[in-house]
Regions:
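Conserved alpha/beta cores of soluble small-molecule-handling proteins
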Residues: 1-110
């Protein structure tokens, strides 16, 4: 298994200890949109603070979406996600309620 930078990951990672609580990672996925424009292609970047305008809707009006995902390693060594299509549906419903552009399912599946 490799990171987004192509570095080999530590194979001793204890996948069975993962929970549905916050699990800090080395990277995070970032994507953006403005107004009614479609979502831009996302990217993996090192985990850390994100730059944000003081006028951001999430700060002024509480308009924001977040969806976490859980991954598992199979007995054959593959990494699989736990119901990513459900994550996509929840985020699409949330975007609709907040009058934001829907997040494409491909963000979660591809």
């Amino acid at each position: 298994m490799f990171t987004s930078e192509g570095k080999a990951m530590d194979e001793s990672f204890d996948w069975d200890s993962l929970t549905f609580s916050l699990t800090p990672t080395e990277t995070m996925y970032i994507t953006e949109t403005e107004g009614d424009a479609p979502w831009m292609p996302g990217r993996l970047q090192p985990y850390g603070d994100i730059p944000m305008s003081p006028a951001a809707g999430v700060l002024n009006y509480g308009q924001g979406l977040f969806e976490g995902m859980k991954a598992f390693r199979t007995t054959k060594g593959r990494i699989v996600f736990f119901r990513p299509e459900e994550n996509a549906r929840r985020m699409q419903r949330g975007a609709d309620r907040l009058k934001m552009p829907p997040v494409p399912e491909s963000v979660f599946i591809d």
